[in-house]
Structure formats: C-alpha cells, structure tokens
C-alpha cells in the first residue's frame, strides 16, 4: 500500500507498524522482525508479505529526514515517535540524522502525515463469530469507525439476522469519510441454533 500501515489493518500504530519499520531498518527479518508485533486485526501476517511491504515503504519513503539514507536511529525513531503522537522538539531531539535536509518538526510531521492511511479505521464491537439462541431477540454489537480527518464516522451494516430461523447469517460493516475514502469491510458470522 506504500503507507505506514505495514500490516494493512487500516491503522498505522506505533507498537506494530512503527516497530516493524524500526526493526527492518536495523536489518532484522523473518521471526526476529515480527516477534510480538502481529495483532489480531493484522491483515498481512506472513514475514514474506510484511518484508515486501516494508521494502516498498523503506525504498520510497523511509528517508524521513532527507539525508540520503534510511537509518534506524534517525528515520526509524522519528516514525516511532510520530506514531506515538510526539510533536515539536520532542519528536526531533537527538534523532535527526547527520546531513539531514528536513530538520524542522513541522516539515517532518507533514511528511509523515502524508503517508498515514487515509481510509477510516473500522473495528468490530464484540466477536466476529457469534452463537445465538433461536427464537430470542438478536441485538447486534455493531462496529465503530474513526477517521484521521473526520473523527468518528458512521458505520454501514449490510445483512440481517432472522432469529426465528436456524442458520448462519453474515453481517458486513464498512465506513466512508467525507473525502470518499472507504474502510476495509469487516464481517460477523451469526449462527442461530436451538
């Protein structure tokens, strides 16, 4: 995808995507690269796919401070700090590389924000797999979505559960922001049985 959302879950997160980029910049690969970083909502989970995504981002966007090289202790730490929400001097102190052409925090923040996922981040409330007792009212837990521009955005659900009829029902959830960016689609499987 070419953005900071390395695991393609719809959100760039310091403790997954940021650490993957930092470890990759240190030269780690395979299990050493991914150990403890794959979350339950990660879409890309294999080391080969993650490394391919990292190679793309590393080559096209990894030189955050513009000094001509991608360095774990400058670019990697800048990204990690940015994803943790640090700004201003707290973002840049001690990590801008030698020969950097981009040194001001505002310019660095602008560059990194341009590579944030643009679509809303959506997540299910509750489980993706639900067992429901037939002939009782089904109350769906729904989903929530947030967007970098719009904040909380409306979630659209398709599908329905007929709690009077045994079977498996699939509900789908998605969201869109005011700029027309559409989230990934999440599903919930509801099995109605006696």
Predicted stretch roles:
Residues 1, 119, 140, 185-187:
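Surface-exposed or flexible loop/turn and strand-edge residues in extracellular/cell-surface modules
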Residues 1-119, 167:
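Cellulosome-associated attachment modules in secreted, modular CAZymes
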Residues 4, 62, 128-130, 136, ...:
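Flexible, active-site-adjacent loop/turn segments at secondary-structure boundaries
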Residues 7, 65, 125, 144-146, ...:
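Residue-level detector of conserved, well-ordered beta-strand and adjacent loop positions
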Residues 21, 79, 124, 143, ...:
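Extracellular/surface recognition and adhesion modules
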Residues 27, 85, 144-149, 175-177:
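Extracellular acidic, Ser/Thr/Pro-rich low-complexity tracts
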Residues 118-147:
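Solvent-exposed, low-complexity, repeat-rich "mucin-like" stalks and linkers
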Residues 130, 148-192:
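Serine/threonine-rich, repeat-prone extracellular segments and beta-strand-based repeat modules
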């Amino acid at each position: 995808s070419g953005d900071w959302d390395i695991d393609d879950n719809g959100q760039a997160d310091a403790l997954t995507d940021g650490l993957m980029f930092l470890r990759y910049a240190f030269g780690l690969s395979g299990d050493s690269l991914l150990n403890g970083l794959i979350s339950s909502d990660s879409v890309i989970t294999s080391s080969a796919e993650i490394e391919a995504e990292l190679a793309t981002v590393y080559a096209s966007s990894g030189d955050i401070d513009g000094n001509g090289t991608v360095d774990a202790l400058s670019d990697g730490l800048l990204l990690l700090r940015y994803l943790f929400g640090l700004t201003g001097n707290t973002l840049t102190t001690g990590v801008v590389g030698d020969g950097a052409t981009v040194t001001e925090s505002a310019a660095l923040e602008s560059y990194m924000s341009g590579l944030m996922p643009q679509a809303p981040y959506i997540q299910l409330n509750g489980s993706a797999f639900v067992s429901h007792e037939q002939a009782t009212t089904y109350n769906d837990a729904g989903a929530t979505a947030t967007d970098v521009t719009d904040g909380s955005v409306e979630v659209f659900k398709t599908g329905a559960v007929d709690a009077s009829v045994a079977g498996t029902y699939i509900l789908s959830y998605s969201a869109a922001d005011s700029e027309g960016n559409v989230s990934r689609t999440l599903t919930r499987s509801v099995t109605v049985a006696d």
